[in-house]
Amino acid sequence: MGFEELLEQVGGFGPFQLRNVALLALPRVLLPLHFLLPIFLAAVPAHRCALPGAPANFSHQDVWLEAHLPREPDGTLSSCLRFAYPQALPNTTLGEERQSRGELEDEPATVPCSQGWEYDRSEFSSTIATESQWDLVCEQKGLNRAASTFFFAGVLVGAVAFGYLSDRFGRRRLLLVAYVSTLVLGLASAASVSYVMFAITRTLTGSALAGFTIIVMPLELEWLDVEHRTVAGVLSSTFWTGGMMLLALVGYLIRDWRWLLLAVTLPCAPGILSLWWVPESARWLLTQGHVKEAHRYLLHCARLNGRPVCEDSLSQEAVSKVAAGERVVRRPSYLDLFRTPRLRHISLCCVVVWFGVNFSYYGLSLDVSGLGLNVYQTQLLFGAVELPSKLLVYLSVRYAGRRLTQAGTLLGTALAFGTRLLVSSDMKSWSTVLAVMGKAFSEAAFTTAYLFTSELYPTVLRQTGMGLTALVGRLGGSLAPLAALLDGVWLSLPKLTYGGIALLAAGTALLLPETRQAQLPETIQDVERKSAPTSLQEEEMPMKQVQN
């Protein structure tokens, strides 16, 4: 008897599993609140050089600015330069000193802003870009983008640590570590007195949040039977969507970056308390030989699900026999993901897919400008469009399979980026439609990737595998903000890069084995029973098959 038979006895889907999904909803909501926070936290409002001595009379200010600030090619006043000397304007007396000295030129000299900047605070009262003494604009705008890169680099490192440690010490313990660390480091970030302190604490916060990304989904799936994995996986992913829409509301209500950071961090406190009711994975406990604790959780699951318990089939001795077949005699390592042919094939393909999913998703999600809507409306729209994409994923993975769904959603993302290259920047409505379509496809790709990857790896290496894919995915997420700086080389280069990577990931997804209707593999041997697929026809994972 294997674990699937044990789970069938205690109930593979019922009040126990639904309570588990509900208790683990908070981490899924908190993730977008932090991951997409730079949309508001690092927003750059309209700004110009500070010009001491500006006239108090409002009617004269336009003339004053015209005399002191050069214009960009699009006709707007420069945000980063000012004239070395005030310029004489027709029908004005400004700049008469230079005119009397005969210093007027066709192209007057300009210099960088030397006395700081003045910001338009109508939309944001404070961001890290406008923070006093930081001024992350113009020559320092790279540091503003780098803040997001530092954060995702932290997520990358955290994914390695949490993936390995949760396979060794358990999902529940490491989830507690993630909660406490996020709370402490989030509060420290909000209290930052310098950019260096902010960058360090946000990097460490990203490392802590990585625990949520790779622990929550497997902890849910390992208590579910095959039939209900899809619906539960899609349901739990809707909490991410809820977090995106909540971020738009919180960002609209709180315009100061420090208070905003506090608002998205403090919910970790009730999350810590909720872990009292979150069960450890019985699958993991059995692979580690913790029979008594696994037996206790299985009995609790049976009681909540209203299942009669058979003393013979669910006795501690019976569970011990299952554990004997599941127990891991050696601690897992990342090298185990590449030791055997089929697992190596899966791992390499997942690396490419996850990099493409994250790179394109965050490239699109963090760019909310140029769509004809304000930042709050765009964020709300991006969140709302994810709901129908969840329905698309639910139907597609059930009937078309995981592999084709993964490839198709990534292809849709790539086409959305490519089509936007053909649309003029003046066509705001079309740009908005294409961006929303791309967001829907990229979110669908993200949802599918979590479900698909969790089903590909065996229980003994599931967290390690999720840690590897999360690591590479966050590498893609950390590079996405920096790729946006490529617009300095060619305006269309960022979109071309995002779309090209998504297209590569779509092709790679077709090389993965199908997992629809397959039970979760328990051991490496379960995965290795069949060679890697070589055709696009549907191939099920080589485990026991169940019918929909």
From Swiss-Prot:
It catalyses: orotate(out) + L-glutamate(in) = orotate(in) + L-glutamate(out); 3',5'-cyclic GMP(in) = 3',5'-cyclic GMP(out); GMP(in) = GMP(out); 2'-deoxyguanosine(in) = 2'-deoxyguanosine(out). Keywords: Cell membrane, Ion transport, Membrane, Transmembrane, Transmembrane helix, Transport. Signal peptide: none annotated. It holds the Pfam family MFS_1. It is found in: Basolateral cell membrane; Apical cell membrane; Cell membrane. GO terms for cellular component: apical plasma membrane; basal plasma membrane; basolateral plasma membrane; plasma membrane. It is a multi-pass membrane protein. Residues 522-548 are annotated as: Disordered. This is Solute carrier family 22 member 7. It comes from Pongo abelii. The lineage of its organism: Eukaryota, Metazoa, Chordata, Craniata, Vertebrata. The gene is SLC22A7.
